[in-house]
Each structure stands twice: as C-alpha cells, then as structure tokens.
Amino acid sequence: MSNSLPLRDQYLTLIDDIIQTTLKGKISSIEQVYQMLLKGITSGTGEVFELVLSDRLSIIQSQVDSETDELKKAKATRSLRAAKTIQTQWQRWQEQNKATEAISLSMREITTATADERLTALLRAIDPNQKYPLNLSQLQQLAKSLQQFATANEDFGQIAEGITHGIASWERIQVNLLNWMYEQQNTLGFGGLPGENSPWASWAKVVNSEIPQVFFRTLAVEQSALEFAQKQQGISLSNWVELTIVLQFLQRGLITWFDSYGALRYQQAYDIKAGPKLSISTFLTFAVIWSQLANGFENQAVKYSNAASQIMLQILRTFTQRPYFPLYGGIFASFSGSYLRDALDYLDAPLRSTAGTQEKARILTLLGYSQRGLGRYDRSLNFHQQALEIARNAGDKTCEIANLNHLSRTYVQQQNYSEAINYSQRALIYSRQTGDKTGEANALVNLGYSEVMEAKETEISEPEVYETAINYLEQGLKLAEKLGDLQSQALCFSSLGIAYLITAQYPTAIKYLENAFKTAQIAGDLYLQGRNLAYLAEANYHLANYEKAVYNGSLGMYLLEQIASQEWQKPASLLNIIKGQIGVDKFQLLLQQNRQKMIAIIGIDGYDYIPPLLVKYQEEM
C-alpha cells in the first residue's frame, strides 16, 4: 500500500485488497484477515478506518439489494460476507488496541497542547465519563512515553513524574483504604470525624509523600482544601499532578467499595444504612474539595484553578448518572450541618458558569431541597426553578417532575398553599403521563399535605375536605410501599401523621409518625427523623404524655440542630413550655429516666448537649 495516498484512500485500498484476496480464495482463516488489519492500520487513526469500512459496507449492501444478475449478485454477496469478516476482525482489533489508542491519543493531546492546556488534556484522559478512560496501568505507560519527551519540554517530565509518584502514593493508601471505617463503626462519612479519628488522618499516616500527606493532615484538623491551596501557591506541576492522581483514585476506590458487595457485608455487620449514603457523601465531599482548590488557586495559579474546576464537574457528572442519585432527599444522612452549609456554598458558585445540562439540573435539585432543609426557602425556590427549566430543556422528565414536587414542598414551608397545590397537581399530571411512579407517589403526598395545610389555615371544619386530602396521602403511601421506596414512604408516613395531628386525631397521628421515624432511620434521613420526632413530641403533649413528649422533643431538637435546620427551635419551644408547666425538677427527672434510650440514638455527647441547647434557645428568643 502506497503511503503517499491520503489516509482514507489507503484504507479503502486495504479493504478492497482483503475482499479481492478473499474472493480469489487466498484467505485461509479469519486470523489472516486480522493480521492484514494489524499491519495496515496505523495506531490513532481508527476513526478514519471505521468510516471508510462503514461506507464500503453500505455500497456493497446496496449492490446486493439491487443486483438482478444472479452471477453478479452472488459475487456481491461474497464481497459483503468478506467485508463483514473485516468488520468483525476490526472490532477485535479495536478491543485489543483501545488501550494503545487511548494512550497514543492522550500522548498526542498533551504534547501538542499549549502550556495552559496540558493539565486539561491529562484530566480528559482520566475522566471516568469518557468511553475509555486511562487506568493505572495505562497511566504508567503514558508516564514512560512522556518521560522520553522530557528533554524537549520540562512540563512533560514533570507530568510524568507526578503520575508515577501519584500512582505510588495511591497504592500505599489502597491497601489501607478502609481502616478508618472499622475503627469508627458508629460515625461514618466525612463531616463529624475530626482529628486522628478521621479518614484523612488515617491516610496521612500511610502515604509516604509530602504533598498528599500535608493535604490529608490539613483536612484531618478540620481545615479546608481552600486553606491548603492558599499555603501552596508555589506548588510544582509534578506535585499538583501527584495530588490529582491520589485524590482521583482515592475517590473512585471508595465509591467502588461502597457500591460493591463489600459495602453490603459492612452494612450487615455494622450499619444497614451505609452503602448509598456513603457513596453520596463521597461524591459530594470530593466535589467540594475540588471546588475549594479551584477557589484557592484562582488568583496565583490559574491553570491549577481551572483544572480543579474541571475535575469537580467530572465528579458531579458521574454522580448524577448513579441510580441512587438522591432526587428526593437523603443528603442530610451524609453531612453535619456546618459541613453541609459549606458544601452547598462551594458547589453553588462554579455551577453558575456551567452550561445547562441534565447533570446541572440534577445537582441544582439536590442543592434546592438541601437549602429547604436548612430553612433557606427563597434560595431553595431559586435552585428548583432553575433546575426545572434546565431539566425541561434537556428532556429529563424524571428530574422535571422531582422539581415540581420540591417546589410544592418549599411553598408549603412558606405557607403559600395555593402555589404548593398548583405545583403538586402539575407533578401528578406529568408523572402519570410519563409513568414516573416515584414522582406520582411524591405528588400524591404533596397534594394531600398541601390541601390539609390550606384547610387548616382557612379554618375549614368540614371533615370531607380532610378526608379527600388524607385519601391522596394514603394513595401515595400505598404506591411508595409498592415501589419499596423508603425515602418516599418516610415522607408519606410523616405527612399522614401531621395531617392527623392537625385534625386532632392524636393516637392515629402518633402511629404514623412513629412509622415515619423508623422508616427515616432505615433510609438514613436525619432531617425527616428530627422532624418526625418534633411532631411526635407535639402529639404526645396534646395527650398529656409528658414523658414521651420530652423524650421525642429532645431527640428531635438535637437532630435538627445538628444539621443546622432552623426547625430545631420548634421542639425547643415546646420543651420550654413543658418545663414551665411541670417544673424544672420533674423535667430533669423525665430526661434522666430516658437517658439510656437517648444515648443509644444520639450518644452521650448528644444527651449532655440537650440542656445547653435549651438555654441557647432561650437566649436567642
């Protein structure tokens, strides 16, 4: 084959030569076809060959379909069979050479990029959203290839060195990846494990490289990645690449384990709520870390800032494609209140400059309902309105319906019940049209709950109004139970309990609220747990069952305050009323009688924090 021909013509000649050789009976096996392809195709040009082969197949297929002469048709059929053999062996060639192709492509992109774009090219090569991201072995090969060009450009040598050191550091961490989990069986996640008990401290002990070690120690003492960046403005390209490799593969290693059977075994042994909860926590934690690094380097090292933003968006894109992406809640299972506030603030800013995509709509959905849980209702509405528009334009009906439901819930919190009913009705219609059963269950609950709250506000006393609303709630619960959706079930039980509480049917309210609390515990939703406990306290108070009111109210107050929800003040107010009615001594006695039960849920530190929290409420009022 003449190399003076354009590449397309070279490959057309190669294909025709194989077909003609086959027709002459000179091809003895498919292996011979494969060897001819191996010899004739240049690495890195597979797309060109694939286009030429596709065109040739189409032409021959047309000849077979249109030819009327039997001899010519038979020859065309044999040619088509030969072309399909080429196609099969080409697919084999692709599979066996995709690693070489990927490395060659990455090498070419890095070495031809401008100085400011070299990191971008490297990050694109390891982006998990790509069809063939480089794995550790391929990265090692890439580093060796780049090292050969180090004399031509110092950056290539630094990138190669960073990759090599990063892989070595990750391999040291990998064998000790989960030690911290088994040492801290009752406290998982990344918010709320300070000092030597944190995963960061655990990894700092085993990594044998300065920059990753300093980074992990910074986070272990509850400083942020932003503070690390501000102290590392002169970080070398090699060190930056090393840290990138370590953090990228650390995050992926954690996610792989949390999504695996290993996590299932851990759940069975220690914590039934672990798997998805920890995966969600990991995705968001590392997204926040990269956002903070982007922020920290934006003034002095723009290329590092841009690279960090690129990684953050890659992580979020991967996260939104997971089946457990929490469209309807659950984030409060993974973070303490202060950590969550930081996460929301850091994820908000970079998303503003990102194009409107399905991924962005889903992240905005998460930000929206999280802001609602924190009591930031205007911000919640803003996020959900943005997400609604983007999801609609992206054709993501599931996300669109979720945001209609969330808008309904947020308007209920603002006591704008007509808007809440409007959005829940729209969600119900769309969910039934599209067959979104989870969306339908949530819409039924939101509609029933909104109507109960509106009837209460307008002081409607007709029982049929409440019966209709409660019927919606019961339909939603039945559907959620059928789906096995714990998050939606918890919301259904809770909404039914509140509806019966509002209508003064206290024993029935308690039954549903207790179920709501238990289901929220299994789902791992701290916000719903705290909220249900607060309403249980109110229901028991109305029945003059002060012991249970104090028990539930104290737990609810503590859990809500821990996630920074302003709703903690509601049970705090009730507890102060009870204390005033029964006296301080009796109140303290009721707390003491339930001490062991409360410690089992919130620990000794949580129990000891209840009296100071009540004092805090009184001081703030």
Regions found by a protein language model. Give the residues of each.
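Flexible inter-repeat linkers and adjacent short helices
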Residues: 1-356, 584-621
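Residues that mark the junctions of alpha-helical repeat units in TPR/alpha-solenoid scaffolds
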Residues: 308, 312, 353-362, 380, ...
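Helix-turn-helix repeat elements of alpha-solenoid scaffolds
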Residues: 331-347, 376-385, 420-425, 463-475, ...
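Short coil/turn linkers that connect adjacent helices within long alpha-helical scaffolds
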Residues: 353-355, 390-396, 432-436, 478-485, ...
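TPR/Sel1-like alpha-solenoid repeat signature
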Residues: 364-367, 371, 383, 400-411, ...
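Alpha-helical linker/edge segments of TPR/alpha-solenoid repeat scaffolds
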Residues: 449-461, 537-548, 575-594
